[in-house]
Amino acid sequence: MADESKFEQAKGNVKETIGNVTDNKNLENEGKEDKASGKAKEFVENAKEKATDFIDKVKGNKGE
């Protein structure tokens, strides 16, 4: 899923750049939205991973 968020960020960057070069504000804004969405998904993925790691660590220390 991390690849999906990175792809969304890259797609957004391309749209934003093309929109900027062609003076197409709609495409530029769509690109900015895609980038922000991709970054948000990546943040959530990282938070989930850290929470899971923490829970696993706590569970592992219970038996000791």
Swiss-Prot record:
Domain of life: Bacteria
Region (Disordered), start-end ranges: 1-40
Gene3D superfamilies per record: YjbJ
InterPro entries xref list: CsbD (IPR008462), UPF0337_stress_rsp (IPR050423), YjbJ_sf (IPR036629)
Entry similarity comment: Belongs to the UPF0337 (CsbD) family.
PANTHER family assigned to the protein according to its UniProt record, in alphabetical order: UPF0337 PROTEIN YJBJ
Protein name: UPF0337 protein SAB0772
Source organism: Staphylococcus aureus (strain bovine RF122 / ET3-1)
